[in-house]
Amino acid sequence: HTISNIQLMALLAQHGAVGFLHGNGSIVTAICDGALDFGENNVEPGRMVSVFSHSDTSLGVSERGLKYEIDDMTMTSTRVNGVSNEFLNGAAAHIGVEHGTLVVTFPSEAPLPAVSWHHTFEGDLGSLDTKVSSALAKHELQSR
C-alpha cells in the first residue's frame, strides 16, 4: 500500500495537484514540472530529505538551501542520486524540476512547502469507477 500511495502522489502531481502522506516522522509528496519551496526551518541535523525521479528522466532538477546543492541536473528512475540530503538549520530550501515528476520525502517537523508549477495542467483524474473488478476471484461455497 505504501508504494501505491506514492504512485497516487505522482498521479496528483502530474495533474497539477499536490498531496502529502504523513507517517513515522516523515512526509512524502511529489512535484511535476514545478517546485517545492520550504520556509526557514529548525529541523534536527541528520533528518533526511530525499528526492527521486518518478519519471524515467527528470530534467532541470535543482536543490538549493540543502546540505548538498544541485542545479540543472538530470535524474533518472534507475539511478539513485538524490538520497540522504539535509535541511540547513534556519535556511529556506528549494526543490524543483523543469520537466518530469519527482517524489520527495522530508522530515515531518519541516514546514510544508509552497508549491508552484511552470505551466497549467488540463484534464482531471477521470470519473470514479465503482464497479467490482472482473479480476476478483469468486469462490462459491460448496455444500457438504
Residue positions per predicted region:
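Long, charged alpha-helical interface segments
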Residues: 24-26, 30-143
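Anionic-ligand-binding alpha/beta catalytic cores of soluble enzymes and soluble regulatory domains
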Residues: 1-37
